[in-house]
Amino acid sequence: WLHFDVMDGHFVPNLTFGPDILKGFKKACPLFMDVHLMVTDPEKYAPIFIKNGADLVSFHTEALDNDVNRIQNLLDEIHRLGAKGGIVVKPNTAIEPFESILKSCDLVLVMSVEPGFGGQKFMADMLEKVVWLKQKREDLNLSYRIEIDGGINQDTYKLALEAGCDTLVAGSYVFKNDIAKIMFSDKDYSDKRIMVKKL
């Protein structure tokens, strides 16, 4: 499972990989490709990345002006194209307004830093969103994964797991340390899927 960040230099100030790079990654290592679109126009780019190997595409609600109808339509289109779909919320975006579309989500990604750059400090108050998502999943009998991205390290991952995260995205911490040791030395950590973010 590989978490693949896509940044357009507009929605977030950084600029990263395009669909051709994803296609190359998929050919070289046929892992499950979790593509996180940090772009101004996810309606345009989601189909392009699916065509080039994305197994799951998540996009920011803010990029669609937090419009529930547009978000629902894009999730439907992603599913129509044969991929899994998910939504992402920035730290300042409430999750509660999107309760009605949770049934269409395969994944909900909570950003625990401002998106765009690695190495930022974990925002612990974002775990309140995780707790809410876990409770709603149980109440509504849904099956979406709860993912968190930003500031995950040897201390914060335990907080994320305790709050209810299924999937942790780690970038800077993984690549600045011994990957094998980090991923497999802690039983609580290795029991969960950690996705290595290509920075």
Q: Which residue ranges define each predicted feature?
A:
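A general structural detector for well-ordered alpha-helical segments in enzyme core domains, enriched
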Residues: 18-25, 45, 70-77, 97-101, ...
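Active-site beta-loop-alpha junctions enriched in small/polar residues
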Residues: 7-9, 38-42, 62-64, 90-92, ...
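Glycine-rich phosphate-binding active-site loops on the catalytic face of alpha/beta enzymes
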Residues: 57-65, 109-120, 163-183, 192
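Conserved anion-binding
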Residues: 28, 44-45, 54-145
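Catalytic cores of alpha/beta
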Residues: 43-51, 93-105, 150-168
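Conserved, mostly hydrophobic/aromatic
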Residues: 5, 49, 108, 133, ...
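N-terminal active-site wall of soluble small-molecule enzyme domains
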Residues: 3-77
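Structural detector of well-ordered beta-strand residues that form the stable sheet scaffold
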Residues: 3, 34, 58, 86-88, ...
